[in-house]
Every structure is written in structure tokens, then in C-alpha cells.
């Protein structure tokens, strides 16, 4: 999938920089549609944070035979990146479960200031001074997020536990992206397996502390009824999209990664407007345009800088 577009041989960036960026854009867009099967699961009895648990545990169980086969053949079992797996898994769990404790709008805004944390972590851990275009993309991206979700003039300052969990989710995702850029994992299976394993552990621990808001455990009948769909979603959605998402930061950079994943908001907003009665007006159009422009700016300007470096 990473080989779809032209090979960028003239830059110091990954030779498939544009292809990976495009693949990440598609993966983020698919996550913007995930509310559709999520609603179906809720109607089937998988409510509250139980869907989040299933999204971690079931893909892990699917990958477990592969891990055992790798070990049998002399390769690593696959749990090679505990820090990355724990950080990214914690970010996803915090994001998903923050909706149980605070307003959706507040959770989205506080989580999606992720590009700010990524830039800060790049400065601290990678010693990267942000170039001028990063400030442009940050302004465009954050303005787009605020225009779409900030109808009440909400300034992203945490005011309750759900707000803090959403904020921490964004910080964890940013930290994991930078960690991936530093470690540059070889092969996708170890990082994917680590994500579902260590992220699953975090999700279960968090569920224990949030048990009062998790809702009652689904009945056995609900689990049995939903299991074919959960397996299908894991195989066709969770595994392929996370292959792209977890493989991207080490290849295109954590900063660009954190901008492109905002495309989830664009697709989610448009799809909700088309398929439901949710509002879609000038805020959604303008904010989505800002987010798309931010992604294009980061991709184009970053590549141009790399080309100029090679021509010096």
C-alpha cells in the first residue's frame, strides 16, 4: 500500500514520503467513519468503554498465533516496543474513554491539540527547531479544530476529569509518535503486536478505575451476537489502519503525522452530516478546509526544504 505513488528519490526524506502520507490520510479518514460501526455495536449491547476493550483484546488474540509462530521460527515474540505500545495504547484508550466523562466537543478539542505536543517533544527530544511552515500548519490546524468544535467560544482548558483524560490522550499519542521517530522500528509486526498487548493492559487497568462510568458488562448473548462483527471489524479495519498509523511516524516524521491524523475530523464531520441530521454549516466547511490546508502545507513545504538541502 505504501508503494502507490511516485518514489521520492530526490529528497532526504523517506523514498515513499508522499505515498505514506497519502496512506495515513486514508487511514485517518477511515477512523472518521468508525462512528458508524460503533453505533451498531452500541445498539447490539456493547456500550460504554466495553467497545474500547474489545478493540484492543480481539486484534491481540488474532495476532497471537502469528507471534507464537515467529517465536517458533527463531524471531522475536513481538513485544519489542513496550514504551511505544503503552504510550500509543494509552492515548487511544484515554481518547475513547474521555467521552464517558466529558462533553464530546471538549474531548475532541483537548485531544486534537496533539500537534502542539508533538512539536514540543520534537524540540526537546529530537533537538529540532520548528521551521517557519510548522507555525503556519499549527495555526491552520488548531484554528480548523476550534472553528468546527468551538461554537460556544470554548477555550481548551481542562475543567474536569474527562477533560484531563482527553488532554493526556493527545500527549500520549504525540509522545508515542516522537518515540517511533527516534527508535525507527524495523518491521511492522512487533510494533503492532506491542500496541495491542501493552495498550490492552492499559485499557483494562483504566477500565477498572472507570468502572462506575463504564456501564454494566454486556451479557453473554450480546458478546456472542456481536463477535462475528467484532472479528470482521478487527480484521478489515483495526489491523490494516493501525499498520499504516503505527508505521507512519518513523517514516514521515511525528510532526506531519500529528497534522494528517486531523483528517479524521473532516471525514467524521462530513459523514455525520450526510448520514444523520447533525449540523453541517459554514463552521464545518471552513474548519475542515483549514485542516486540509494545514496537512497540504506541511507535506509540500517539508519536502521542498528537503530538496533544497540536497541541492546545496
Task: Give, region by region, the residue ranges found by the protein language model.
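Hydrophobic alpha-helical transmembrane segments of multi-pass integral membrane proteins
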Residues: 19-23, 49-65, 137-140, 164, ...
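Loop-to-transmembrane-helix transition segments
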Residues: 19-27, 71-94, 160-169, 217-240, ...
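Helix-helix packing/entry segments at the starts of transmembrane helices
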Residues: 22, 54, 108-113, 180-199, ...
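Hydrophobic/small/kink-forming positions within alpha-helical transmembrane segments
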Residues: 32, 85, 89, 93, ...
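C-terminal-most transmembrane helix of multi-pass membrane proteins
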Residues: 56, 262-312
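C-terminal transmembrane-helix exit sites in multi-pass transporters
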Residues: 62, 67-70, 114-139, 266-286
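Hydrophobic transmembrane alpha-helices of multi-pass small-molecule transport proteins
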Residues: 63, 133-151, 283-302
